[in-house]
């Protein structure tokens, strides 16, 4: 963790995927928007709140497009760029694709930040794109009151490999590939209450590319995928349940958490986005009686560059989990199962 002359987080009112508009607000904004005639080539659009748009270009191939940007959740400019780039790339992997190029999205308060700081943000993002073997082929920049950085990413995918958030089937096992708690860690960081060890753990998690999703999509026993980001495990779980018309049964005791997440949440170091996520999705969630507020906050904790939530055939679940672990995801865990029923997430 580097000391920065200006704390990037002091220049932003929010950070990471906790900056996302509340789902309920987003629904209001998108309601009654003019709709173009249906496009046969648009295989995935806005209908199920999936991770990216997918456009079929011929019988076998499609293009995947996504964009993600946010304000800083850390002060080290290079680390900010790395997290933002990994987060943007994740949507391509979650759909089963592989990225081919990115465009940078940059808004900076140039009167408050030196050029060297902004250059370091861009360098951090470029380093992650280099790790993903893609170029940053251009972009757009503005002078803005708060620092903003992210990417628009284009990827390719075989039509047969597309993995939506709407394919979960009753009986499927649920696998989560990364630990939960990035939002809690970022809240603690903002208040200078995060240990150096926890910071390093957060950086390792948020900069770990989800490219295993591309490999998993070639397995016919993997039925649905989504990445867990700003709406938290519950929010993205509800989207998966609604997309497939199923219920998700998740065992709280099996959920992998970052090492200090539960302690920090119990101490009240949670984000405002956690409450907004509950307000938007809580009506589709069943919690045990007497669930403490801190547990609920962890379940709705906004993740930045979070893990993949995967629904797969139960008889292959352990083998698939092992494949994920071997790809560099030591926290990959089977956390529950898919059941028939009204779309909901049920926590046990």
Curated annotation (Swiss-Prot):
ATP binds at residues 20, 48-50, 68, 91, 139-141. Keywords: ATP-binding, Kinase, Magnesium, Metal-binding, Nucleotide-binding, Selenium, Transferase. Mg(2+) binds at residues 51, 91, 227. It catalyses: hydrogenselenide + ATP + H2O = selenophosphate + AMP + phosphate + 2 H(+). It comes from the Bacteria. InterPro entries: PurM-like_C_dom, PurM-like_C_sf, PurM-like_N, PurM-like_N_sf, SelD_I, SPS/SelD. GO terms for cellular component: cytoplasm. Homodimer. NCBIfam families: PRK00943.1, selD. Synthesizes selenophosphate from selenide and ATP. HAMAP family: SelD. This is Selenide, water dikinase. The lineage of its organism: Bacteria, Pseudomonadati, Pseudomonadota, Alphaproteobacteria, Hyphomicrobiales.
């Amino acid at each position: 963790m580097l000391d920065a002359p200006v704390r990037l987080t002091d220049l932003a009112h929010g950070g990471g995927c906790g900056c996302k508009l509340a789902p309920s607000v987003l629904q209001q904004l998108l309601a009654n928007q003019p709709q173009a005639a249906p496009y046969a080539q648009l295989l995935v659009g806005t209908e199920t709140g999936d991770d990216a748009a997918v456009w079929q270009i011929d019988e076998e191939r499609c293009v995947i497009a996504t964009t993600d940007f946010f304000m800083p959740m850390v002060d080290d400019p290079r680390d900010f760029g790395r997290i933002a780039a990994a987060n943007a790339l994740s949507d391509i992997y979650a759909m089963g694709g592989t990225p081919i190029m990115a465009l940078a999205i940059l808004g900076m308060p140039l009167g408050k930040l030196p050029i060297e700081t902004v250059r370091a943000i861009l360098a951090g993002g470029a380093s992650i794109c280099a790790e993903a073997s893609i170029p940053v082929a251009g972009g757009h920049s503005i002078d803005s009151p708060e620092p903003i950085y992210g990417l628009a990413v284009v990827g390719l995918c075989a039509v047969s490999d597309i993995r939506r958030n709407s394919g979960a089937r009753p009986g499927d096992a649920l696998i989560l590939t990364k630990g939960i708690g990035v939002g809690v860690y970022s809240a603690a960081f903002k208040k200078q209450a995060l240990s150096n060890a926890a910071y390093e753990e957060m950086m390792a998690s948020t900069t770990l590319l989800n490219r295993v999703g591309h490999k998993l999509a070639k397995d016919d026993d993997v039925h649905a995928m989504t990445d867990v980001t700003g709406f938290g495990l519950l929010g993205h779980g509800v989207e998966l349940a609604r997309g497939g018309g199923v219920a998700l049964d998740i065992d709280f005791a099996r959920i992998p958490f970052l090492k200090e997440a539960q302690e920090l949440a119990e101490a009240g170091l949670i984000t405002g986005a956690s409450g907004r996520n509950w307000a938007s999705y809580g009506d589709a969630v069943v919690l045990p009686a007497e669930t403490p507020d801190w547990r609920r906050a962890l379940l709705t904790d906004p993740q930045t560059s979070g893990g993949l939530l995967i629904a797969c055939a139960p008889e292959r679940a352990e083998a698939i989990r092992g494949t994920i672990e071997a790809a560099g995801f030591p926290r990959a865990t089977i956390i529950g199962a898919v059941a028939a029923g009204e779309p909901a997430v049920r926590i046990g």
